[in-house]
């Protein structure tokens, strides 16, 4: 019985060895031929046709990937800015309401300014605060004063010059 059971295993080993005979014996895609440049990576050379089927058409984007990435980021930025523009439309409405309140409070300020002492220095400070840094620097340049520094420093220089 043992002989009969060993016989089918021998025949199955022989059929399996037929399929495994051409495969590499060690490592992935290794060959039995000694490489001309030892120590470097072995080159795999495909021995079968790798061209795509006749009906297959491959289209690739010829544009540089960096440029494509930047354009996509720009498009995303524009779409997000469109969303923020929708909220910005609400902003001017609120600002208009704030301006109406400022008009009312400016009348009160004018009445209070005549009552308070030193109000001229406060209005001068407010005038300087409302100016942009560029305008403040232009004014300092006209007077021959240094134009470097923060906005508060620029305002202090203009006040001391006046």
From Swiss-Prot:
Phenotype caused by lack of the gene = Reduced sensitivity to abscisic acid (ABA) in single and doule mutant lot1 car9; this phenotype is rescued by CAR9 overexpression. Increased leaf transpiration leading to lower leaf temperature and reduced drought tolerance. Increased CAR9 transcription but reduced CAR9 protein levels and stability, especially in nucleus, and associated with increased ubiquitination and subsequent degradation by the proteasome. Disrupted recruitment of the ABA receptor PYL6 to the plasma membrane.
Q: What is the name of this protein?
A: Protein LOWER TEMPERATURE 1
Q: How would you summarize the oligomeric state and partners of this protein?
A: Interacts with UBC19. Binds to CAR9 in the nucleus; this interaction is repressed by abscisic acid (ABA) and is sensitive to calcium ion Ca(2+), leading to free CAR9 accumulation at the plasma membrane.
* Organism listed in the record: Arabidopsis thaliana (Mouse-ear cress)
Alphabetical list of Gene3D superfamilies matching this protein: SAP domain (1.10.720.30)
Keywords for this protein = Abscisic acid signaling pathway, Nucleus, Stress response
Gene encoding this polypeptide? Answer: LOT1
Q: Give the region (Disordered) as residue ranges.
A: 71-130, 142-162
Q: Where is the composition biased (Basic and acidic residues)?
A: 75-93, 142-156
UniProt similarity note: Belongs to the DDA1 family.
Locations listed in the record: Nucleus
